Each structure stands twice: as C-alpha cells, then as structure tokens.
C-alpha cells in the first residue's frame, strides 16, 4: 500500500462569525487559515461578520455560487446564545447535510472539554458541489 500523499489542493474560504472579534484578534480564523495553508490548500477568501443571519447567508451564498471555491469553513455562531444564528442562517443553503459530522465533532471535543462540547451545534454539508463546515468559534 502506498504511503504517498495525493493531496489535491483546494480553494477554501474562511468566515469568522463574531460580535466581538476584529481582524486583529480573530484567533480562530487565523488558526484555520494557517492550518489549511500548512496542508497545502489555498485561501480563496476570508471574512469576519457579526452574528447576523442575513449577512452570513449573503456572504456564504456568494461563495457557494463561485465555481472556483471548493470549500467553506465557518467558525463561530454555533452556540445557544440569543445572537448565535449560524445554523439557522446556513442550513437552508445546503443541498445535502453530512450526517454524523456534528456528532463526531462533539464526541472528539468531549475528550478535551467534557460536557461543554454539548454547547456546539457544529454541522457540515454540501451546496452546489461546495463543502461547508460550521464549527464553534
């Protein structure tokens, strides 16, 4: 069995959803960009938006419609506070949800943060052949 890495570099957009972060202190977004580039992927675009479902939906819809975008990673807005609206904003955009992703994410998180992992509404799916992953901030 070959152990060579046949990575196909992807063009990925990163969106941070936060009412308190700025480009200067967006540590989650910075980490995601560094991690995807370290694996050989390309940053297609990056944005930081407040917790506003209509702004989120508009930005992600634009990226989904762009044939040059292979994937989108959204960080933030997946909790249970009154302003957290990432799932409500983006689930309607999916053509297909990725069953089990949220459960797996919470199971892995449980090993590090215990029952606090239950506060995440992480999810993933596909829209217009673009993969979408929504993670806690």
What are these regions (language model features)?
Residues 1-137:
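Non-catalytic beta/alpha edge segments that cap or flank active sites
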């Amino acid at each position: 069995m070959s152990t060579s890495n046949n990575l196909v570099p992807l063009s990925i957009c990163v969106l941070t959803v936060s009412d308190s972060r700025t480009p200067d202190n967006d540590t989650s977004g910075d980490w995601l960009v560094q991690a995807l580039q370290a694996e050989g992927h390309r940053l297609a675009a990056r944005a930081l938006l407040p917790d506003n479902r209509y702004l989120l939906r508009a930005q992600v819809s634009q990226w989904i419609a762009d044939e040059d975008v292979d994937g989108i990673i959204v960080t933030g807005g997946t909790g249970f506070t009154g302003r957290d609206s990432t799932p409500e904003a983006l689930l309607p955009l999916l053509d297909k949800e990725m069953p089990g992703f949220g459960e797996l994410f919470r199971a892995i998180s449980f090993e590090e943060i215990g029952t606090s992992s239950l506060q995440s509404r992480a999810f993933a799916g596909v829209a217009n052949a673009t993969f979408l992953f929504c993670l806690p901030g």
